[in-house]
Amino acid sequence: MQIDNKIFLVSGGASGLGAATGELLVKAGAKVMLVDLNAEAVAAQAQKLGCRSVVADISNEAAAEAAVKATVEAFGGLNGLVNCAGIVRGEKILGKNGPHALASFSQVINVNLIGSFNLLRLAAAAIAETEADADGERGVIINTASVAAFDGQIGQAAYAASKGAIASLTLPAARELARFGIRVMTIAPGIFETPMMAGMTPEVRESLAAGVPFPPRLGKPAEYAALVRHIIENSMLNGEVIRLDGALRMAAK
């Protein structure tokens, strides 16, 4: 599917992977709606890129529905969704303060998994109403997992579970939506330079980068966005999880 003049919704669009994806899509000629919970940041990013933005908690049914509706009303349809929104919470199953809090586990699952699926199902319904191209393709949905889905570390029970579920969702979703001409793919990034890393010291960042076989550095959001572009443009990519990690395999801790 060509990107030019196509319509995309990007969650987590205010910063990091989502912001880089939105920027690439706009530069490629797409009509883009950024969605984020941070109203000020997403509005500023949209103004910078010259696209649209909407504020929404993607785990909320009504809010996500409103975001998809706003996109369709603004641009006249929908061709793609890139789910980049997510949170990280580190907590041991049995820590110094006792068992893992159920509330924090639920929060991570709610944002990362429920939020992604919420937008996926709503976007799929909107994309299914879009006119198919000559090959019968209507659109593509790209979710974001993590290498933690496969190499979850100690303290990542909630995060790894949420991302593992997204990885597992990929194939059944792709199979089910194939009859509508909708592809579903997932990217599982390694360690990237995002706001989630901002609180780490230079020493910690260097240590993490040294663990990547090649290139021995943190990934750049633009590299994630470049893979998004390739997935959109290569119609044979469907139902697969692609690790984007420089051959990184996370240690237990």
Predicted regions span which residues?
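Canonical Rossmann dinucleotide-binding motif of NAD(H)/NADP(H)-dependent dehydrogenases/reductases
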Residues: 2-32
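The beta1-alpha1 cofactor-binding region of Rossmann-like NAD(H)/NADP(H)-dependent oxidoreductases
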Residues: 39-40, 56-67, 102
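Catalytic Tyr-X3-Lys loop
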Residues: 87, 98-118, 142, 159, ...
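Conserved mid-core segment of classical short-chain dehydrogenase/reductases
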Residues: 87-106, 125, 129-135, 155-158, ...
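Alpha-helical segment proximal to the catalytic Tyr-Lys
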Residues: 125, 174-176
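Residue(s) in the substrate-gating loop at a strand-loop-helix junction
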Residues: 146
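Short, small/polar-rich loop/turn modules that mediate ligand/substrate recognition or access, typified
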Residues: 178-183, 237-240
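C-terminal substrate-recognition "lid" of short-chain dehydrogenase/reductases
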Residues: 220-244, 249
